[in-house]
Amino acid sequence: MELAKGNAEIQVGIADYKVAASPNRLITLGLGSCVGVVLYDPVKKVGGLLHIMLPDSTQFNNVTKPAKFADTGIPLMIDEIKRLGGIPSRLTAKLAGGAQMFSGLDEKFVLNIGQRNSKMVKEILSRMGIRILAEELGGNRGRTMIFDIASGQVTIRTIGSPLKVI
């Protein structure tokens, strides 16, 4: 994992994560049923942004991208934050995404993946003792998540809505 220098805006892809220190910003696009997880150490001013697609890696035989899943991606990102000096007991979380992007279809067909992603992320964070400070979950529209590490502020851009700071 490379640490960006200076005041960069670092893109986080789908099924990926990035960690960085202040004054960098992390941004991820395309949060539909996916969930964006921001973890932040406000004392050290380091944090990460994870863009998960699925809740549980145990349903798959060969996991080549652990950041794709909540159960493997969150611990992986915490390890990277620790390498930057972050302390797990100080971490707080902010969440966005988990939408139902295919409304109108048979619910059995779409498997409520956004809802399942959100639930799994919350369960994992709870087990790890990480407090969720804010969330922008559910609905039926895509989101962009922008994490300003200097301030800890997360801005959510939702299609058809004004910017929201959480």
Swiss-Prot record:
One of its GO terms (molecular function) is protein-glutamine glutaminase activity. GO terms for biological process: chemotaxis. CDD domains: CheD. Gene3D superfamilies: 3.30.1330.200. InterPro entries: CheD-like_sf (IPR038592), Chemorcpt_Glu_NH3ase_CheD (IPR005659), Cytotoxic_necrot_fac-like_cat (IPR011324). It is an enzyme of class 3 (hydrolase). Its EC number is 3.5.1.44. It holds the Pfam family CheD. Signal peptide: none annotated. It catalyses: L-glutaminyl-[protein] + H2O = L-glutamyl-[protein] + NH4(+). Keywords: Chemotaxis, Hydrolase. Belongs to the CheD family. PANTHER family: CHEMORECEPTOR GLUTAMINE DEAMIDASE CHED-RELATED. Probably deamidates glutamine residues to glutamate on methyl-accepting chemotaxis receptors (MCPs), playing an important role in chemotaxis. This is Probable chemoreceptor glutamine deamidase CheD. It comes from Desulforamulus reducens (strain ATCC BAA-1160 / DSM 100696 / MI-1) (Desulfotomaculum reducens). The lineage of its organism: Bacteria, Bacillati, Bacillota, Clostridia, Eubacteriales. The gene is cheD.
